[in-house]
Amino acid sequence: MILHGAAVSVKTAVAMHRISYILYNYEQEFAPEDFYIVGSNQVLLNYITGVLPELNVYGVSQMTMEQLFVRLLYEDWDKSWKIKPVVKGVTPAVKGTLVWFKELENFCLRYEYRAIPREDVVIEKTGKVLLDRATIARLLKETKNLSRADKISRLTDYLMARLENELSGKYYSYTQPEKQKLKHYYETYFGKREWKGSVAELYEQFLKEEQEKDFPVEVPDGSYDVYDLAAMAYLYKRIKEDTVIREAGHVVIDEAQDFGMMAYASLKYCLSKCTYTIMGDVAQNISDRYGLNDWTELRKLMLPGEFDYFGILQKSYRNT
């Protein structure tokens, strides 16, 4: 749900009552720990969550958008690093846009293209094609938006099924040692799920490629703004993660206009199983090109379903 309303419309109170309603009516599916409340600063967050005890809700996590992306970096966040604010006129505005997210997506596709074999998979002894390049291309296309590890798993499962059919077939016979050797070889043919690289170094590689395309961006030196963190969290989820870590089931975002589409696109990918309550007033976007000036792109990204809702508070609920 996206909720638009002016400052006096008490969007926050509506959202907090929604949390209370969900917890009361769906207690088997949700616990307070399943909710994250995300805002642009700690003062605002303290005010928001101050309402919850009055609704008999305790244990809900609160964090800034920067803190959420740091959380999603897990072990790749170095505690010596620092979070820096987006500075109007200094931070390149493109970093907060959907265009920038698409650049990052394409970078990951190129990285995976180089890392994952795409030629015919052939058994040397018999010349048997286990998996042809067309099938590999089709499987990669079908899994385009999955993580690198999930792509590898899908390809490996398909390949190993073909191998089992070949080893149990009647046209060629294989000794037991040959079977074991082939299985051992092909189970990591497309690579291992585990990726031991550095997300920060991969992000630096991305930025350097973008510099060559004349994007006016700099490589951070241990200090990262919200859009750096959003990009790194996406890289972690897309390239590094090999075991899914359970996060929130529902995320509430206040003052949504303060964040650009790069943050939302990354969040949507990293927390793809989440539902969202997003509140804001695009007329209050004082960041110009760094935040949201309208809801069009965000509605398209976050509200694809038939029952997703975009609402406008037409009057104040402060005194009603």
Q: PLM ranges: what are they?
A:
Residues C270-T320:
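Conserved RecA-like helicase ATPase core segment
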